[in-house]
Amino acid sequence: MKKRGSRSLAQVIRCKTGKYFPASVESGTKKEKKHHYSTASKEKEVLRKRAAEFDVLVRSLLNKQMPKNPDQILVFTYQKGFVETDLHNFGRYSVKL
């Protein structure tokens, strides 16, 4: 058995890992930065104002669309947009605030 130093052993392991798992070598050991949102009062006011504008927009869109069936509920999903569902299938959609 051939003896190798720790550095050469690490290079061999890296080379073999690159052959079998190329994505893991490309990403390396660098970690992506996590985005932290500032809690400054000025930014909070801007976010509240934007949330209120979005709320008014969504409510106006919902008021324009009168449901044909009163048992149906209109739910917004990012994958499908607005979806009508009944109370029995409402549990499939999660609500995140």
Swiss-Prot record:
Tree of life domain: Bacteria
InterPro entries attached to this UniProt entry: LtuB
Protein name: Late transcription unit B protein
UniProt source species: Chlamydia muridarum (strain MoPn / Nigg)
Gene name of the encoded protein: ltuB
